[in-house]
Regions:
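A short, polar/charged loop-to-alpha-helix boundary motif
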Residues: 154-157, 213-219
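Short glycine-rich anion-binding loops that position phosphate/pyrophosphate groups of nucleotides
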Residues: 16-18, 88-89, 134, 209
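Residue-level signature of catalytic and energy-coupling elements of molecular machines
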Residues: 11, 131, 193
Length: 219
C-alpha cells in the first residue's frame, strides 16, 4: 500500500466493500477522495441510517439485530412485514430475508449466518429514483437529472431518465443529495437512492461511487 501511494498523486476507490484499515494507511500518505468517513458510513447499514437520520432525513424505520431477542423486540417495535438485512456486504438482494409475519423470524435470522443485521420496516412507495451527484474540492455540487429504477429479484433491471417526478420533487431530490454530500465534506461522485412516497422522499441508501443506476452517465 505504501509503494502504491507513493506512486500516485490522489487515491480513489470504485466500490465500498474495501477495508477502512487500508485507507487508514493511505490517507497519511496521499489525499483520498471520497474520504474515509464516507466509506465507513456507506458500507454499514446501521451507520448509514444513523448518519442520515442525524441529518433530519427520513429512512425506513430500523433497528439493530444481533440475536433472537433483538429481533423479537425489533419486530414488536417496527411490525411486519419487514426485511432483515446484514449490516455489511449485502447487495443485489443478497444478505436479505423477508419477514412477512413474526413466525418468519427464526428462518430469517438463520439466513444471516450469525452476521450482525438490521431490521427495516417496509415502505409503501410509488417508485424508486436515484440521484447521481458530484461535489468538487471547492464545495460546488452538480447533479444529473434523477433516474427512475425498476428492480427484478432484488437486482436493478432498468433506469429511466428522467424519472416521473414533479418539479418540486425533482428539486427536493437534488437538494437532498447535496445535503448529504456537504455533510460528509465529500469529494467525488455519489449515488443516492430514494423512495417516492405520498409523504415525501425517503432515503434508501447511498453509494460512494457512480451507482449502477448511473452507468448511463458515461454516455
Amino acid at each position: 500500500l505504501t509503494a502504491f501511494a507513493k506512486a500516485v498523486d490522489v487515491i480513489t476507490y470504485e466500490f465500498e466493500n474495501i477495508p477502512t484499515s487500508a485507507l487508514d494507511v493511505l490517507e497519511a500518505l496521499r489525499p483520498i477522495h471520497p474520504n474515509r468517513r464516507a466509506l465507513g458510513i456507506s458500507q454499514d447499514r446501521i451507520a448509514e441510517k444513523d448518519f442520515l437520520t442525524g441529518l433530519g432525513l427520513t429512512t425506513a424505520p430500523y433497528a439493530r439485530v444481533t440475536g433472537a431477542e433483538d429481533l423479537a423486540g425489533a419486530i414488536a417495535g417496527i411490525g411486519t412485514p419487514a426485511i432483515l438485512k446484514t449490516t455489511r456486504l449485502g447487495y443485489d438482494g443478497k444478505g436479505q430475508a423477508r419477514i412477512m409475519t413474526p413466525d418468519d423470524a427464526a428462518t430469517a435470522l438463520a439466513a444471516m449466518n450469525g452476521a450482525e443485521a438490521v431490521l427495516e420496516g417496509f415502505i409503501t412507495f410509488s417508485h424508486e429514483v436515484s440521484v447521481i451527484a458530484a461535489r468538487g474540492q471547492d464545495g460546488s455540487v452538480s447533479a444529473y437529472d434523477p433516474g427512475e429504477n425498476v428492480h427484478r429479484a432484488g437486482i436493478l433491471h432498468t433506469t429511466t431518465v428522467p424519472a416521473k417526478l414533479t418539479p418540486s420533487q425533482r428539486t427536493d431530490a437534488v437538494l437532498l443529495a447535496a445535503r448529504i454530500l456537504n455533510a460528509l465534506d465529500y469529494v467525488g461522485v455519489m449515488g443516492v437512492e430514494l423512495f417516492v412516497t405520498a409523504k415525501g422522499l425517503i432515503v434508501n441508501e447511498i453509494a460512494p461511487r457512480v451507482h449502477n443506476s448511473g452507468h448511463w452517465t458515461q454516455n
